[in-house]
Amino acid sequence: MNAQLSALQQQAQQLSASVTRPIPGSRKIHVPGSRPDLQVPMREIALTRTPTLFGGEENAPVTVYDTSGPYTDPEVRIDLSAGLPALRRGWVEERGDTEQLEGLSSSFGRDREHDPKLDAVRFPARSLPRRARAGANVTQMHYARRGIITPEMEFVAIRENQRLDAIRDAGLLQQHPGEAFGASIQKVITPEFVRDEIARGRAVLPNNINHPESEPMIIGRNFLTKINANIGNSAVSSGIAEEVEKLVWAIRWGGDTVMDLSTGKHIHETREWIIRNSPVAIGTVPIYQALEKVDGRAEALTWEIFRDTLIEQAEQGVDYFTIHAGVLLRYVPLTAKRVTGIVSRGGSIMAKWCLAHHKENFLYTHFEDICEIMKAYDVTFSLGDGLRPGCIADANDAAQFGELETLGELTKIAWKHDVQTMIEGPGHVPMQLIKENMDKQLRECGEAPFYTLGPLTTDIAPGYDHITSAIGAAMIGWFGTAMLCYVTPKEHLGLPNRQDVRDGIMAYRIAAHAADLAKGHPGAQVRDNALSKARFEFRWEDQFHLGLDPEKAKEFHDETLPKDAHKLAHFCSMCGPHFCSMKITQDVRDYAEAGMKEKSQEFRAGGAEVYRQG
């Protein structure tokens, strides 16, 4: 180990306190499953007692979904250079259908492993990859179609329910009926239902056998709406330590998956550090790295280079690949009259390759070969929308929908191989055209999970596209999209920093939750009900803690009312002590109750007769 490596490790170990401190007002809990090694992480928010003025009852803790891994647990010691514990290794090994390799299969991976110039940035804890035994298929879809409930399936069933069965307060369980547009929303998520949805292709459980550190999570329209956060270095910004911290930051605020879109130096090494320290599924766009291998010349790409890249990343543990196999040669001319042409990086790379060679997209012609790789490691397809609209003027055009139809064709091929598959979607779409996107995707792709970037509903707000897109995300999530890819305020302007990542995730957690409420997902309204009760009872700390971002809520409150005494006050700085609508409402209730008591006493004093002569 040289001095440079020591410096990098020291830098990587110094995750900032803002990233690792416990989330205020809550603690990490683990809900047991049917076996000792199945412990499902959640977060329990402690609530204070209702003030005597409002009844003085106890308020039970509220359990919520948690994506932060061990990083917010003060009982856990984090060692980034060792990586997270291999939670799922035993589950993978006990199935007996994989084998540990003696070394890396990818020629590029082997070259990187033995290059002494990379000692300073290489992840220090070497682990040998696993692969399916000859003739075996190790995907969760393959197991599900054979009627097997894996530990991963039980894990996500427990996780989705969020201990709903433990709630005894009927007020918290109150919920408006949802409109699910034909989705099969369940009152209780069972392992059997998880298995059946994966077998049908309506849900995916992205868990590469070489990412045993991951905590299983499910993506499907009949489950909680998930969100993805993008990170990654570029030629002009960010390094390995910054990307690891950005990962931990993203999952702290609620990223269900993270895509590493690195295009700068040390892509391979950066990804290894990220995967080994990630409790959530990691996705990539392999064509980005393949392009780096040919010095950025799209026309120089070959199937052999791309295939080696897929194997390299699969053996590192990438859980899902964006593959732009639907960008066909015949669709490229359809983009010529668009306002913004082809805006997808992957789409433009493949379009340029097709035109340079005047051949069909090699990702399309080699799709079954790709399926063979995917099922050997259980990598999930995220079929890329390389021809998505880059402005609302281009929405729902022939190029976009032609590609979507091809993605439906490819989905059927992937399912023939029992490879889990989700479909990527737009993009920029005005509100009135959003449902058409969802309906066509369900129809063309057999209800495979839809994974959309927004969509952005207007193009006039650079710097605020986390808002323009969250509007569309909430709508399309309600209509049936299973996962929403976040957009940050920096969209179209630059690479996001930490605050941008936080703002983007918060916008999308709001959108996803709004979609779950509208669909009528079981228990979706519990947190809203708990927070509303706390708000009416002026339990300020509980309001902060029940919010999606407790730190910001407290920060905003304390800007004008910073004293501890203000946490007990029956007003906020918006209205002050004399004009608080909730305080006035409580006074009205008190007057009404006093009036009823007075009338009751008058009734009894009059002989308690229902009818009296005047």
Curated annotation (Swiss-Prot):
Keywords assigned by UniProt, alphabetized: 4Fe-4S, Iron, Iron-sulfur, Lyase, Metal-binding, S-adenosyl-L-methionine, Thiamine biosynthesis, Zinc
Pfam hit, one: ThiC-associated
Superkingdom of the source species: Bacteria
GO cellular component: cytosol
Cofactor(s) this protein cannot do without: [4Fe-4S] cluster
GO BP term (any one): thiamine diphosphate biosynthetic process
The protein's assembly and partners: Homodimer.
Membership in a protein family: Belongs to the ThiC family.
Name the record gives this protein: Phosphomethylpyrimidine synthase
Species in which this protein is naturally found: Stenotrophomonas maltophilia (strain K279a)
Gene name, Swiss-Prot/TrEMBL: thiC
